[in-house]
A protein has these predicted regions:
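Divalent-metal-activated hydrolytic enzyme cores
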Residues: 1-35, 67-91, 102-169
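Glycine/charged-rich beta-loop-alpha catalytic/anionic-binding loops adjacent to active sites
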Residues: 57-68
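Short beta-strand segments
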Residues: 40-42, 64, 94-98
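N-terminal short beta-loop-beta anion/metal-coordinating cradle
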Residues: 18-59
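Generic beta-strand structural signal
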Residues: 58, 91-93
Length: 169
């Protein structure tokens, strides 16, 4: 793992490279952002939204949490959604899950891990809802299928939020 000095050095090199390519880059970026997309994704460090989509700073509004959940009581996520919809007027919302999600796997394993257990209950609910389908599968396929079902459930949650219902009126 890189130390903080390496991160700071990398950031300085990144900034320098951008200014060399486009001297007004940061000045332009400070005036406004105009993303067309809101990305709700997993906190997993292997799923970097901008890098996966090839978008630059200002082009993608991002919210990340463990297992890309959209929960009706999560004021952080809902605030991001409302800001994206009402202020930034994004055109599309992407809920991006991924195979091999550690949050989904932890929910299946049902080991005590502390505070995160409360968060994982939402995935366990999906597990129980689809247990007859999932129970017959090999472990790896079970996790991947639960990752897919989780994304579908979060799309449902988002679509039934007051924010989206108001936006669609």
């Amino acid at each position: 793992m890189k130390d903080i000095d390496t991160l700071i050095s990398n950031n300085a090199l990144w900034s320098k490279m951008l200014v060399e390519e486009d001297p007004g880059f940061f000045e332009t970026l400070t005036h406004a952002q105009n993303p067309r997309f809101l990305w709700i994704g997993c906190s997993d460090s292997r799923v970097p939204a901008e890098r996966l989509t090839g978008l630059e700073p200002g082009e993608l509004f991002v919210h990340r949490n463990v297992a890309n959940l959209v929960i009706h009581t999560d004021l952080n996520c809902l605030s991001v959604v409302q800001y994206a919809v009402d202020v930034l007027e994004v055109e599309h919302i992407i809920i991006c899950g991924h195979y091999g999600c550690g949050g989904v796997q932890a929910a299946i394993e049902n080991k005590e891990q502390g505070l995160i257990d409360n968060w994982l209950l939402h995935i366990r609910d999906i597990w129980f809802k689809h247990s007859s389908l999932l129970g017959e599968m090999p472990q790896e396929r079970r996790i991947d299928t639960l990752c897919e079902l989780n994304v579908m459930e979060q799309v449902y949650n988002l679509g039934h939020s007051t924010i989206m219902r108001s936006a669609w009126k």
